[in-house]
A protein has these predicted regions:
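Formylglycine-dependent sulfatase
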Residues: 1-174
Length: 174
């Protein structure tokens, strides 16, 4: 595919809910206008499944395209020594590497949780992740900014959105 026809790709991973929990898939009890907007203006997956509906193995499967029995992340990586030392998918090819090889500019902003989070992973031009694991939604936050420990104060959603928007604005024109 030529560069002129190559689509932009922006992925939002959300945690801890089933498809049935979102209004865009028919739930009328939940109000989520931003997710509804994204679903109506982008690609909406209507036949997608996870091999393991738990945070860490689901993320590892998304990034590698492999099953937990293949990539080795079988359960949630606890916010403890395990999250700091578990190699997770560090030694495996991830989707960001493949996209980089195809000429894309890649970034991760937010929760990695498929291996150690403090150091940037192969394939990502930009890396802004939780230092270890997700923190309270408001207050002092610890992040890994390109591998450097930084602390920020505020709402997680605002801090992460600002980082993502900066990455999108600062990337080279293509």
């Amino acid at each position: 595919m030529s560069d002129a026809r190559r689509p932009n790709i922006l992925v939002f991973l959300t945690d801890d809910h089933g498809q049935w929990a979102l209004p865009t898939y028919g739930n009328r009890e939940i109000i989520a206008p931003n997710i509804d907007y994204l679903a109506s203006s982008g690609a909406r997956m209507s036949n997608a499944f996870t091999p393991c509906p738990v945070c860490s193995p689901a993320r590892a499967s998304f990034f590698t395209g492999r099953l937990p029995s293949q990539h080795g992340v079988h359960d949630w990586l606890r916010e403890s020594e395990q999250a700091l030392t578990h190699p997770g998918i560090d030694d495996q090819t991830n989707i960001a590497e493949l996209l980089q090889d195809a000429g894309y500019h890649t970034g991760l902003v937010g929760k990695w949780h498929a291996a150690r989070s403090a150091e940037p992973k192969r394939g990502f031009d930009r890396w802004f992740s939780y230092q270890v694991a997700q923190y309270p939604h408001f207050g002092e936050q610890n992040f890994s900014d390109q591998g450097e420990h930084v602390q920020r104060t505020g709402h997680q959603s605002t801090l992460l959105t600002d980082e993502a928007v900066d990455f999108l604005r600062d990337r080279p024109d293509d």
